[in-house]
């Protein structure tokens, strides 16, 4: 009886450690994905002197910024299908 209980405890410990590894790998994959998205070259629009002016040049963007006098589209709007 004691051997059965100890075996069950060992099996549960192994399953718990494997699930922790799976969670760690999944969170690492999310970090990689978000890093890849940040590396995408942003769209660039016309000249600007401040951020609000960029919405006129980049109407399809959710977030625009004026970077070094040029409008940069950071997140493009994609309509739902």
Curated annotation (Swiss-Prot):
**Subcellular location(s) per record:** Secreted
- One record GO biological process: killing of cells of another organism
Q: Which GO terms describe its cellular component?
A: extracellular region
Chief localisation class: secreted
**Iron listed as a keyword:** no
Q: Family assignment? A: Belongs to the DEFL family.
Any idea what this protein is called?
Answer: Putative defensin-like protein 265
Q: Which organism is it from?
A: Arabidopsis thaliana
């Amino acid at each position: 009886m004691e051997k059965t209980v100890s075996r069950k405890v060992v099996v549960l410990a192994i399953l718990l450690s494997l699930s922790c590894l799976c969670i760690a790998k999944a969170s690492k994959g999310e970090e990689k994905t978000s890093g890849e998205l940040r590396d995408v070259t942003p769209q660039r629009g016309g000249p600007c002197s401040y951020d609000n002016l960029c919405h006129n040049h980049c109407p399809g963007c959710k977030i625009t910024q004026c970077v070094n006098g040029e409008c940069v589209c950071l997140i493009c709007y994609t309509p739902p299908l």
